[in-house]
Amino acid sequence: MYGVSPLLLKAVAQVESNMRPHVVNSTHTANTQSQDIGLMQINTRWLRRNLIKSLGYTEAHLYDPCTSVKLGAWVLANNFTRHGASWEAVGAYNAACTRLKGDACRRARNGYAWKVYRAMRKSS
């Protein structure tokens, strides 16, 4: 989907929600006014983006596993466009680095990418 490997999507879902489609992460709501929802833990900030908004997606859609994977693939594809086909792009799925900068951003992205890599190795 969007040119993103199904194995990568499965690994991200494993890391993000442990394959549970109804998980909600509200730990950063106070700081970001957003939540991560569903199988791929799509951040509700994505719903404010013009393309996603124009497609009519709402918070309720994020609980649907198929929609969650579709939007997760879209986010990853956009990351690959911005960062190249790299583990940094995978890390950016979880660490957008709007607040983290420099080495702190790189550490967060590398740590997340490593988790996804290990999940991919386990499932293959």
Per-region residue spans from a language model:
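Catalytic glycan-binding domains that act on GlcNAc-containing polysaccharides
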Residues: 1-124
